[in-house]
Curated annotation (Swiss-Prot):
It comes from Bifidobacterium dentium (strain ATCC 27534 / DSM 20436 / JCM 1195 / Bd1). One of its GO terms (biological process) is proteasomal protein catabolic process. There is a cross-link at residue 63 (Isoglutamyl lysine isopeptide (Glu-Lys) (interchain with K-? in acceptor proteins)). Keywords: Isopeptide bond, Ubl conjugation pathway. Protein modifier that is covalently attached to lysine residues of substrate proteins, thereby targeting them for proteasomal degradation. The tagging system is termed pupylation. Pfam families: Pup. HAMAP family: Pup. This is Prokaryotic ubiquitin-like protein Pup.
């Protein structure tokens, strides 16, 4: 059964935050670009030496 929560807004708070939308969009674009860069780095490492990369995350002999 889904739960519904009532959102309480003050009289000062606008219903639509049109002013903050461009800023949020820019932040999202920056975040997406940064994430893409990290994923590209991981992909290039995996292409060159996947075994060593995965081995760095695996415990050996109870370490």
């Amino acid at each position: 059964m889904p739960q519904e929560f009532e959102q309480i807004r003050s009289a000062d708070q606008p219903l639509d935050s049109e002013e903050s939308a461009p800023v949020a969009g820019a932040r999202t674009d920056d975040t997406v670009d940064a994430l893409d860069a990290v994923l590209d780095d991981i992909e290039s490492v995996l292409e060159t030496n996947a075994e060593e990369y995965v081995g760095s995350f695996v415990q050996k002999g109870g370490e």
